[in-house]
Amino acid sequence: MPMRLRCHCKATFAALAMLACAAFAGCASTPAEPVPFKPVPAARIVRPGYTEPAAGLVAVDVRRERSRDVIVRFRDALVYVDGERVTDLMNGEHVVFYLSPGVHRIGVSTQFDPVVELGFLVTADPRYTNRASVTFNEDHRIELHRVAQ
């Protein structure tokens, strides 16, 4: 019986060693490729007129940056264009608005934050970017920034 117990112990140790090697082999030395942003589902768009392309309108991409912070990860960010609520963004989503050239007010908020607005110059000029980023600061407050391509 003691001989059989020793064999069991060795087999268990060997299995654990192989499992540990397999786990460490999965650790890559380079980070994974970034995952593309998911579009907001059509069912969550309250005012679809802002998300439909048309002649003379310029595409404006608003992205909700990914966060690992559990406090803000599952909060939806309400998105407003010129004072009208259009949709909400979850972690890792984006929405494309089609707006006329000129200055528009793009705003974001959560159930805990007041609306934060950004005067956003929409232009077809390729020297400017038509992309905005929704993030949360270290106090878990929502922020909106214009970002470069």
Predicted ranges, named:
Residues P2-L16:
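Bacterial N-terminal signal peptides that target proteins for export
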Residues H8-K10, A22, A28:
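Secreted/luminal cysteine- and crosslink-motif detector
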Residues P2, C27-Q149:
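Short loop/turn and low-complexity linker motifs enriched in small/turn-promoting residues
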Residues A14-F24:
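Bacterial N-terminal signal peptides
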